[in-house]
């Protein structure tokens, strides 16, 4: 009723599923799709892959895209968000996107790793 009455429809991200110990579960994108179908209104996504969110994060961290890496488990939100913000990207294969899925996308991450632990040796010493 609120959306049909003129309220703005804002959602955090378009991810249809999210990983869990029991397998993938419906996520924000699935709920947003349900509301869209019922109202005929598409949401404005404020989170990944929205470039405004990435720019705000870089500003908050006082970081630059040239020296920042986006690490994530989804090609369609995490990797594309990093690429659109001008960052190098790392796809971690412990989540939603699997190695066999990468070729379906017209873009590529800078690097693909099996686990976040594979990046530990790349960290600068503290």
Label each PLM-derived region with a short phrase.
Residues 1-126:
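Asp-based, Mg2+/Mn2+-dependent phosphohydrolase catalytic module
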